[in-house]
Amino acid sequence: MGNLRKDYILERSSIISPSSVKKHNSKKCPYCPGNESMTNPSLLSLVAKDGMLQRLQDGEDFFVTDWSVRVFESKEPAVSTSTPNTYSDRPLYSEPAYGYHYVVVASPNHKDSLATISVEQWSNVLVVVQDRLRWLYTQKGVTYVSIFVNHGKESGTNIQHSHINMVSFSTLPPIIEAEAEASHRILNEKGVCPMCQAKDVEIAGPRQILQTEGFIAFCPWAPSYPFEFWICPKKHNTSFSKITQKEINDVSLILRATLGGLTKEVKDVSFNLAFHLSPEKKNSKQIHWHIEVYPITGHWSGLERGYGVFLNTISPEKAAEALGAACRKELASLVGIE
């Protein structure tokens, strides 16, 4: 299995994992109903019955059918719990790429996307994600759980059926570590959470896209991608695993409305989506959790790759204006307002 290596100088990580780049060659989609044998057995399958959601899982000789959300271990994992126990220090730093890699299939319908499923279905998906997140943090060797989406041909996915990846790590990913350290420093220096500060600035401002009762979506002041946007709780909150069903329903509404608006405003857009969550086991590394969406509308140049300076062809204010109109229309249709 793979190993996690670090840059000679920077806290930049690479997972060397040949098993995670296998091409899907079958004409059958392994995530569609009826093809459950093409994946690992489900650890959790949500099944609607008599108006209730049942939590089931595959057995040794049978597969759960009529599911609405399905979770299983990836057959092409980026990390593994059976990695060789080998370490080396800098300049050739290496450690086992230890962890769990789960796939959460968001809908039984192959043609559905995260921009078209119902708000209720989004809620079901997030309930499952929250369930797996809580379980993962009870496991030895799990320091952080990343939750991300690759949508579209340019996103890095090799299976188009809508799904969410959950990948755990034994160390903090560099971006989360840097974000946590910066948040902690600003909190100590200014006495305010930087995400709360950003939220207060962006509410009703020129970069706001949409807001619901408990969440706001906005294009960040210094985006890395054209049409990039973030979704964050209005109230200070560091734990996604503890949010209530009401909050799950609310964030599902704004996710569905903004992704629906994005895909209508930017035709055939691929995107990546990442949950930036606190590491549950490190109280000194807490962050105001939020979701970041990165539309892929072009290619990075040497400026971005070589220097970390991002060139944007549209201002976040203009992007928010266009996305806001599309997302408000999407929200109105979702809540039954014409």
Regions found by a protein language model. Name each.
Residues 250-268:
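Extended C-terminal subregions enriched in glycine
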Residues 209, 243, 247-250, 254:
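Alpha-helix N-cap/loop-to-helix boundary motif
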Residues 1-161, 167-238, 246, 268-272, ...:
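Active-site microenvironments that recognize anionic phosphate/pyrophosphate groups
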